[in-house]
């Protein structure tokens, strides 16, 4: 039974990821005053299926000088971790209702760094290694602010369980009292998922395509699926933290519609940002975090710790 539950979670995720690639190409197309994919199937709807068939039927080439085990393990680990992070998400009921769901998701996103590092190192290519080192430095750096912002939100939530965020936001979305945190969170999620304008790992002019440059066919598709699954997952997380959907136990489908619309809006905002902004320079990327975001998030975290003490003489409730 548990396996059926897992499969019923994985298949919709993979379908959502497949069609997100189509939505991205369509959105970018219309923003550049062109049509986007429109040949394969009606309105190009079968394009992701055609892409998947093409990628998974190609021969997966492996460089002679690469480290075989790590080279093969890296994309499998990337996709496995990307799918595992969906387990505690309440939509409206999670697959496993964890007491420390937030910590579990932070731990999984930290482990994803290893798949990037292994792929860059095992490829035995200088471009892949430089891309991987950039990605790792960027991901680890932005996780610092993500963790501090999460701590601030959890102080308002009063629990590490994700489901209680729905109850916390019944009367007021947390984006209103904590809008600076929400803005920094959104920018940090862009950096965490290696999306434009923070896609330094894929600098075409200097690094070809980054840490996955030596990958082809199936393993490349697995990295691709992992990246887009992480994008949707991060937007779901943002919706949970700051745009809590109203949940009526007697009509859970209303929650699902509300939740999906907000997640879709945030995902299209990701694509809109990609179409609008040029890439950051690497030093600007690091300065933004260590010199701007970190002091601000620390100050706001202290504010959220001291507020209940000063206003109600009670310690923070977590």
Curated annotation (Swiss-Prot):
Key word Protease present = no
Q: Name one Pfam family in it.
A: NADHdh
PROSITE patterns documented for this protein = COMPLEX1_ND1_1, COMPLEX1_ND1_2
Cellular-component GO terms for this entry: mitochondrial inner membrane
- Keyword Transport: yes or no? yes
GO biological process terms on file: aerobic respiration
Q: Which residues form a coiled coil?
A: none
Q: What is its EC number?
A: 7.1.1.2
Q: What GO molecular functions are on record for this protein? A: NADH dehydrogenase (ubiquinone) activity
Q: In what way does this protein cross or attach to the membrane?
A: Multi-pass membrane protein
Catalytic activity line of the entry? a ubiquinone + NADH + 5 H(+)(in) = a ubiquinol + NAD(+) + 4 H(+)(out)
Name the residues that span the membrane: 2-22, 70-90, 100-120, 147-167, 171-191, 223-243, 253-273, 294-314
Tell me the keywords, alphabetical order. Answer: Electron transport, Membrane, Mitochondrion, Mitochondrion inner membrane, NAD, Respiratory chain, Translocase, Transmembrane, Transmembrane helix, Transport, Ubiquinone
Instruction: Write out the annotated subcellular location.
Output: Mitochondrion inner membrane
Q: Disulfide connectivity?
A: none
UniProt function note: Core subunit of the mitochondrial membrane respiratory chain NADH dehydrogenase (Complex I) that is believed to belong to the minimal assembly required for catalysis. Complex I functions in the transfer of electrons from NADH to the respiratory chain. The immediate electron acceptor for the enzyme is believed to be ubiquinone.
Q: What PANTHER family does UniProt report for this protein, alphabetically?
A: NADH DEHYDROGENASE SUBUNIT 1, NADH-UBIQUINONE OXIDOREDUCTASE CHAIN 1
User: Belongs to which family?
Assistant: Belongs to the complex I subunit 1 family.
This chain's protein is named NADH-ubiquinone oxidoreductase chain 1
Q: Origin organism of this chain?
A: Phoca vitulina
């Amino acid at each position: 039974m548990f396996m059926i539950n897992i499969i019923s979670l994985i298949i919709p995720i993979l379908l959502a990821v497949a069609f997100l690639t189509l939505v991205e190409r369509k959105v970018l197309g219309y923003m550049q005053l062109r049509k986007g994919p429109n040949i394969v199937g009606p309105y190009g709807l079968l394009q992701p299926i055609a892409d998947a068939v093409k990628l998974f039927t190609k021969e997966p080439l492996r460089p002679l000088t690469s480290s075989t085990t790590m080279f093969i393990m890296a994309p499998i680990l990337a996709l496995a971790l990307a799918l595992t992070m969906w387990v505690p998400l309440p939509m409206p009921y999670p697959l496993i209702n964890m007491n420390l769901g937030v910590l579990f998701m932070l731990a999984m996103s930290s482990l994803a760094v290893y798949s990037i590092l292994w792929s860059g190192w095992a490829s035995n290519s200088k471009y892949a290694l430089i891309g991987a080192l950039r990605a790792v430095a960027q991901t680890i750096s932005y996780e610092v602010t993500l963790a501090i912002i999460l701590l601030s939100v959890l102080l308002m939530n009063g629990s590490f369980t994700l489901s209680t965020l729905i109850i916390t936001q019944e009367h007021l979305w947390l984006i209103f009292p904590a809008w600076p945190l929400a803005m920094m969170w959104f920018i940090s999620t862009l950096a965490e998922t290696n999306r434009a304008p923070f896609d330094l790992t894929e600098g075409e002019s200097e690094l070809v395509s980054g840490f996955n440059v030596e990958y082809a066919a199936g393993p490349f598709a697995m990295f691709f699926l992992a990246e887009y699954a992480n994008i949707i997952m991060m937007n779901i997380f943002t919706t949970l933290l700051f745009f809590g959907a109203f949940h009526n136990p007697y009509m859970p489908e209303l929650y699902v519609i509300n939740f999906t619309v907000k997640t879709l809006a945030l995902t299209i905002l990701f694509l809109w940002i990609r179409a609008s902004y040029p890439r950051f320079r690497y030093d600007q990327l690091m300065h933004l975090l260590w010199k701007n975001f970190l002091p601000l998030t620390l100050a706001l975290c202290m504010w959220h710790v001291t507020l209940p003490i000063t206003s109600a003489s009670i310690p923070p409730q977590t």
